[in-house]
Swiss-Prot record:
It comes from Bacillus subtilis (strain 168). GO terms for cellular component: membrane. This is Uncharacterized protein YqjU. Keywords: Membrane, Transmembrane, Transmembrane helix. The keyword Transmembrane helix applies. It comes from the Bacteria. It is found in: Membrane. The chain crosses the membrane at residues 7-27. It is a single-pass membrane protein.
Amino acid sequence: MNIGDVMFQLFVFIIFAAVVFAAVTGFKYAKNRKAQLDRIEKKLNSLSEDHD
C-alpha cells in the first residue's frame, strides 16, 4: 500500500466520522431544545394560571 492510498482511506474515514458525529450532535440538540421549550411552556402556563 502506498502513502496515497493510506491518506485517501484516512480522509474518507474522517469524513464518515464527521458525518456520524454531526448527526448524533444534531439529534441531541433537537432533543434538548424540545425539553427546554417544554419547560418554558410549563413555566408560562403556571404564570398565566397564577395571574388569573
